Amino acid sequence: MSDARLFTSESVTEGHPDKICDAISDSVLDALLADDPKSRVAVETLVTTGQVHVVGEVTTTAKAAFADITNTVRERILEIGYDHSDKGFDGLTCGVNIGIGKQSPDIAQGVDTAHETRVEGAADPLDSQGAGDQGLMFGYAIADTPELMPLPIALAHRLSRKLTEVRKNGTLDYLRPDGKTQVTVQYDGTTPVRLDTVVLSTQHADGIDLESQLAPEIKQHVIDAVLTELGHDTLDTSAPRILVNPTGKFVLGGPMGDAGLTGRKIIVDTYGGWARHGGGAFSGKDPSKVDRSAAYAMRWVAKNVVAAGLAQRVEVQVAYAIGKAAPVGLFVETFGSETVDPVKIQKAIGEVFDLRPGAIVRDLDLLRPIYAPTAAYGHFGRTDIELPWEQLDKVDDLKAAV
């Protein structure tokens, strides 16, 4: 083991069993929100050999979308690429079991009529929506990349997206949907200086030779292609160690290889371990769940702080009590990278951003079917889709506030 400071992050493709589950849960959410934007949704999915189980709690007026959940499930599996038993899973023929009930009225009471309205007599309409649960959520941004994400997770996601791209466009038509990437970067302080290791494991058709075909073609069409496009100022990518399918074979994959569950890739979904995580998963949850909406808001806050030049990197924590609208806590950490007093940064955040759940939903326009595309390749720093929490619309307000 080298004495170098090495940090590692991983990503997975949309065909990974856990990501199939995230995709199904978010596809169900989007279908319900499209017909009834006020739908309350908490949907969990399990996949295993030949079976999909979708469970949870839903309150909605979207009767047609609710009745069509089975078809929504099948369509998403087929879109991912599991369309034949040769791939270990087939969206057309797999069993789909639905076990969904209504949202608890006790929870609904706290969301629909917050403590501020119910007990304290608040008149502001935004005080009427309480947090759907207690919890703590983190947001992070760093000037490592143009998208203000830590480099290791940003690079791992690019590799995963490229792996899926060359499978779907037929460049490497022997690839199958399941896959993982991992990137290890050497740091000098907090500056990424050298790409040390790339690990890429991909499901493939039987009979594909690793040394003569798979490894060199993955290097050419995925790894080299991504590194050529990267163009990072401080990172030396000239001689990384590359490990392709280091077990030697990856034919059996997807739900036949491993069971999958919604919400089991929360580090992949966020900052690759570079920043802290409050523990709550995202997929399958409507925005009344602060696990999701407040984590998005914290990314929005952090990204605007860095883009405003107030710090080179920032981590923001918010916390809620179930049934309360106002956060119970806000914490800002700039790691000594700030250009102004951190106390002023925290005060500016409080002035510029309204972190009550109803305000987050309003300001980010979250009652829309925008969630299925986030189920793979990360919820933050996306360069391939537009997401409201990635917008830099508060930079001038923050500058003025400090």
Curated annotation (Swiss-Prot):
Asked whether the keyword Metal-binding is assigned, the reply is yes
Could you tell me which Pfam families the record lists for this protein?
A: S-AdoMet_synt_C (PF02773), S-AdoMet_synt_M (PF02772), S-AdoMet_synt_N (PF00438)
Keywords noted in UniProt: ATP-binding, Cytoplasm, Magnesium, Metal-binding, Nucleotide-binding, One-carbon metabolism, Potassium, Transferase
Subcellular localization, as worded in the UniProt entry: Cytoplasm
Residue ranges crossing the lipid bilayer per the database entry:
none
Give GO cellular component annotations, separated by semicolons. Answer: cytoplasm
Catalysis: reaction(s) = L-methionine + ATP + H2O = S-adenosyl-L-methionine + phosphate + diphosphate
Give the binding site residues for ATP.
Answer: 16, 178-180, 249-250, 258, 264-265, 281, 285
Tell me which residues bind Mg(2+): 18
Recorded hits in HAMAP family, A to Z, give:
S_AdoMet_synth1 (MF_00086)
Q: What is this protein called?
A: S-adenosylmethionine synthase
Q: Which organism is it from?
A: Mycolicibacterium vanbaalenii (strain DSM 7251 / JCM 13017 / BCRC 16820 / KCTC 9966 / NRRL B-24157 / PYR-1) (Mycobacterium vanbaalenii)
Gene designation: metK
